[in-house]
């Protein structure tokens, strides 16, 4: 957990629990908060280590990265911290491979084995939601496996590619579609799913890569006239209109046009 001077609002993290720290927990929380930056919390199974750390987050009020040594424990911690902090951006970031077979060569039989992978679509969505939360919020807890140490590309380039939409914005439909392509969204007029968009006249529907919702954009040929959040399956409006909306990349590996030219 970082102890750097991070500017954040008071009571940004709100711990929700019917229980209070008991036994050795209050002393452990106090020492973890006041002690050196690098410490180890030891405890038997069921002693409330996760609850203790939730109280540390509540006290320090700082964005937190929690690294687990495997995906199973990371999933358990993710659910527990979501229960403790239902109003905050608790995110899940682990490897999205259900199966990974690296390429290999067997000299004894002169056999080449091609690389084979199977990506979990739900985990990919949660990974994108984690990085989107880091760009848009301060009250972020990321529960991760060691996959978080690997490079995802430049966060500067990732942030530059954000598509900012607003009702009344003067932009052509073709410019919007070009920017969606830059964000790695693909056009799919007949199979609308996560990370795609479809075009019907002056209406553009965008199925967000990091949420279970979609955005409907209405254009009059010169400017955006309406922004709505819709259900991606039924296409029905989710009861309210938007004034502004930012669209974040559909994939982590993003290169700006200048870098693509190079």
Stretch-by-stretch model annotation:
Residues 2-262:
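ASCE RecA-like P-loop NTPase motor cores
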